[in-house]
Amino acid sequence: MYHTRTSLRTIQRTVWLPTDDTLVYNVSMSVLPKFNRGVTVLAVLSALDRRETYGYEIRREAFRRTKGLFTVNEGALYPLLHSLVRRGLVRVRQQKVRGRWRKYYRLTERGRKELSTLRHDWKNSLGVLNALLG
């Protein structure tokens, strides 16, 4: 069995010695949503790295760059964009297109630095995963 007083959120600071499949399943269920969120952040910032664009194009760019392996969920995209704007990583402007207002997003200098850091961190993480899986 495993220590039950420590929540799974503190798993990074705790060494676990699983004795059954329950722990592995619980760890996977707590890690995968964070992994997907991290991939979504990387996909959105990467889509904005080349040019200013709007939400639908961000989703298309992520889909195109991953050859259809990853899609940015619309329900996750706009809250994430608002968060990135609040954090100063992305700027937003509005423009009227065919009678409707459209929000265009672009990376700030701070956003470019964050993207560079994320790319470096993800490359290191992928190296570890490849070593473990390969």
Question: Where do the language-model regions lie?
Answer:
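Intrinsic-disorder-associated, low-complexity terminal segments enriched in Asp/Asn/His/Tyr and depleted
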Residues: Y2-H3, D21
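Amphipathic alpha-helical dimerization/coiled-coil segments
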Residues: S7-T19, N26, K113-G134
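Short alpha-helical segments that sit at the start of domains
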Residues: Q12-R51, S83
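N-terminal helix-turn-helix DNA-binding core of bacterial DNA-binding proteins
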Residues: L32-A76
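Basic amphipathic alpha-helical segments that dock to polyanions
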Residues: L77-L84
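Beta-hairpin "wing" of winged helix-turn-helix
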Residues: V85-W101, R106
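Basic, amphipathic "hinge/linker" alpha-helix immediately C-terminal to the N-terminal HTH DNA-binding motif
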Residues: R100-R119
